[in-house]
Amino acid sequence: MRILITNDDGINAPGLEVLEQIALELAGPDGEVWTVAPAFEQSGVSHAISYTHPMMIAKLGPRRYAAEGSPADCVLAALYDVLQGARPDLVLSGVNRGNNSAENVLYSGTVGGALEAALQGLPAIALSQFLGPETEGLADPFECARTHGARIVRLLLERGLWDGEDYRLFYNVNFPPVPAANLRGHRVAAQGFRRDTSFGVEPHMSPSGRRFLWIRGGAQQSPTLPGTDAAVNLEGFVSITPLRADLTAHDRLAELEALIG
C-alpha cells in the first residue's frame, strides 16, 4: 500500500510523527509512506490553495518533503510532482493537535488536506487528537491517537467505505481527550456545533503605538449537540464522521424553490 500523509501543524509537528507511525503500520514492510507537509504551521487555513504565488518545496529525506504552502497545496504537490504520477492508495491528514469536530471542521487545514485528496478521487481521512484536562498530565498527549489510530483507519479500509463514483466523500476522525486505556470505543456521529464558541478578536497595542488584533477562539470543552462529534468525544469515544465537499443544504432546496423559484 502506498500512503501519502500531510498535516496543517507543519513538518516538525509531533502529531505528524504519530501519523507516520500509523501509516507505517498500515502500509506494512512492502508498502510506501510519503510525507509532504507544510514547512510552517498552517492551522486554520481550511482548504486554501496558493495559486497566486509560487510554492517552494524541499526534499528533507527519503519520501519526505516540506512545502511552503497549505495542506491542500501539499496534496497537489505530491500528486502532480513528488510522486511523479504514482497514485497513493490512501491519503491521511493529521494528527492534528486539538480537535477538528463541530464548527472547527470549517476552519481546519487538516480537514482541507483530506478534502483536496477526496476531490482528486482518493480515499482520504483527517485525524485529530482532542485535548483536555485528562491529556494535560500525559507524557504523550497524542497517546489515544497513537495507540488506536491504525485500528480505526483499518476499520474504515476493511469495510470498503469508499465508492469510486463518490469522489467527494472522505472521513473525519477525532480521538477523545482521554488516556488510551480509557477509550470507550468509537461512534459514527454527525458534525456538531458549539453555539457559544465562535471566534472573536482581542485588540492590543504594540510598544510603538500601533493597534493590532489577535483572533481568539472559544472554549473547546463547551457542550454541543448530543450525539454529534464533539459530544461523543467528550464522552470518551472516537468520532467518525463522513463528510463531503458538497456544502449544499439539500433539505432546503425544495422550500427555497417554492418561495422564490
From Swiss-Prot:
Cofactor, free-text remark: Binds 1 divalent metal cation per subunit.
One GO CC term, this protein: cytoplasm
Annotated keywords: Cytoplasm, Hydrolase, Metal-binding, Nucleotide-binding
InterPro entries the record matches: SurE (IPR030048), SurE-like_Pase/nucleotidase (IPR002828), SurE-like_sf (IPR036523)
Cross-referenced Pfam families: SurE
Enzyme nomenclature, EC number: 3.1.3.5
Reaction it catalyzes: a ribonucleoside 5'-phosphate + H2O = a ribonucleoside + phosphate
Keyword Metal-binding set for record: yes
Record's subcellular location: Cytoplasm
Cofactor: a divalent metal cation
GO MF: 3'-nucleotidase activity; 5'-nucleotidase activity; exopolyphosphatase activity; metal ion binding; nucleotide binding
Binding site for a divalent metal cation: 8-9, 43, 96
Entry's family note: Belongs to the SurE nucleotidase family.
Functional note: Nucleotidase that shows phosphatase activity on nucleoside 5'-monophosphates.
HAMAP family: SurE (MF_00060)
Record's protein name: 5'-nucleotidase SurE
Organismal lineage: Bacteria, Pseudomonadati, Pseudomonadota, Alphaproteobacteria, Rhodobacterales
